[in-house]
């Protein structure tokens, strides 16, 4: 699973086998928490996450949704800068 970004202690990753894991999403890991977020709107898809970190991941996904969707479609993964 390529790491896309480290965001204030949150690791944002994407699975390599994206075609088997629709709808397009990213995984976020923060300490003991793991969750999946939709790329299209940044909403929590599965798992649990603290509220402030959930808001930060959503903001990140919305900002980079085009880049994340392109990675999902092509399998060409690269690191994205964190947001403030």
Predicted features, each with a name:
Residues 1-84:
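Basic nucleic-acid-binding interfaces
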